[in-house]
């Protein structure tokens, strides 16, 4: 059977692409290598309330807790408090990620998409240099699926892009190694997602505490791979928990480990092929969060697919509309935040403490790069030289 689009991966990016494409009349198939959508969970489970604007989730069962905002703790304990609308795409809800993924996939199927579980994509089908479908193994059966467009939504370890000639290799400098417990029997402020910074806490990254209830929270860590060594993330996470008065009595009910891309977005379009979500590196380089950009990018990809199907044109030039649109929608933010990441990596804990001191009492009317720079330099003029690259970005 031939499809307009075969989507490899049933995460938020893949299922959103399928949902919106099917809604516009495209014949769509999702391939999921695992036996269950949304499992295992590999996420801190925070997402901004802007997710509601995309209408991909019904009901509220996927919500574990509502957040009022975020608190950022400098190495010396200085705290910056931000309201949810100012705190970025990872603050608003803490979710049950397995239910979150299932709900988006269910919505895609309701709109007409098909879904195959236990189906591992093993390569691309080509006629000459033209991609015409996907090779896969469904349970123990080798199959070929014909499609005009293949969408790589296969996550941080994406192979689809490489098969099409896109360099998706991540350098250690652009990869976070992560570990997370879901702890119970703890004390936590249910209203806030907490982030802890410091070279001794999480080199090149941060520790997060995302409450899922009054005595349950996801407590995790991301460490930049170029600054890490085997077992470091887990060792530092255990140390943090053992020294935190509200967490040290906690007991784990779930553990997960993985990797998160924190580099710049990659090339996302070839003839007959698109990349979305983590496979496209649509992840905030500072926070490592990517749920909003995955859903948003999936919607833009779907609209491009629908247009291509209508025109019956699937070449790179036609599909490049997708890349142009995501760059305009959130690409500039990702590029800016990559520069911010590089600046933060160069800073000593002393400088991070100065940053927090500058911002702790600042009343943000808007959370813009320029407003942050003004607040920082206004209280600590010596920071100006360190922030010059950021100031240049803010004024261009």
Task: Annotate each predicted stretch with a short phrase.
Residues 14-15:
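N-terminal Rossmann-fold NAD(P) dinucleotide-binding loop
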Residues 78-100:
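Dinucleotide-binding Rossmann-like beta1-alpha1 core, especially the glycine-rich loop
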Residues 306-396:
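C-terminal helical "tail/cap" subdomain of flavin- and related membrane-associated enzymes
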């Amino acid at each position: 059977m031939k499809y307009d689009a075969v989507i490899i991966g049933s995460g938020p990016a893949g299922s959103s692409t399928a949902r919106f494409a099917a809604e516009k009349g495209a014949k769509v198939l999702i391939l999921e290598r695992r036996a269950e959508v949304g499992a295992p969970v590999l996420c801190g489970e925070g997402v901004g309330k802007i997710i509601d604007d995309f209408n991909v989730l019904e009901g509220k069962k996927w919500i574990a807790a509502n957040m009022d905002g975020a608190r950022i703790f400098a190495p010396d304990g200085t705290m910056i408090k931000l309201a949810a609308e100012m705190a970025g795409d990872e603050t608003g809800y803490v979710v049950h990620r397995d239910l979150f993924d299932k709900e988006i996939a269910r919505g895609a199927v309701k709109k007409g998409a098909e879904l195959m579980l236990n189906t591992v994509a093993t390569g691309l089908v080509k006629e000459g240099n033209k991609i015409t479908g996907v090779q896969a193994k469904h349970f123990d059966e080798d199959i070929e699926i014909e499609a005009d467009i293949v969408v790589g939504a296969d996550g941080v370890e994406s192979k689809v892009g490489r098969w099409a000639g896109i360099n998706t290799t991540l350098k250690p400098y652009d990869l976070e190694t992560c570990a997370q417990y879901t702890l119970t029997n703890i004390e936590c402020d249910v209203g806030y997602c907490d982030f802890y910074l410091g070279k001794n806490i999480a080199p090149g990254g941060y520790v997060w505490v995302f409450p899922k209830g009054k005595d349950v929270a996801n407590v995790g860590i991301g460490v930049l791979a170029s600054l890490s060594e085997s077992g470091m993330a887990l060792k530092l996470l255990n140390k943090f928990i053992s020294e935190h008065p509200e967490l040290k009595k906690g007991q784990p009910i779930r553990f997960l480990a993985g990797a998160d891309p924190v580099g710049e977005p990659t090339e996302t379009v070839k003839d007959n092929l698109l990349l979305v979500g983590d496979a496209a590196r649509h992840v905030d380089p500072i926070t490592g969060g990517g749920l909003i950009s995955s859903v948003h990018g999936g919607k833009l990809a779907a609209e491009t697919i629908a247009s291509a199907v209508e025109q019956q044109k699937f070449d790179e030039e036609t599909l490049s509309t997708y890349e142009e649109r995501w760059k305009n929608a959130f690409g500039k933010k990702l590029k800016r935040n990559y520069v911010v990441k590089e600046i933060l990596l160069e800073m000593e804990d002393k400088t991070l403490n100065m940053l927090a001191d500058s911002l702790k009492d600042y009343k943000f009317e808007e959370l813009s790069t320029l407003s942050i720079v003004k607040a920082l330099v206004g209280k600590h003029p010596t920071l100006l030289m360190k922030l010059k690259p950021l100031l240049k970005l803010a004024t261009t």
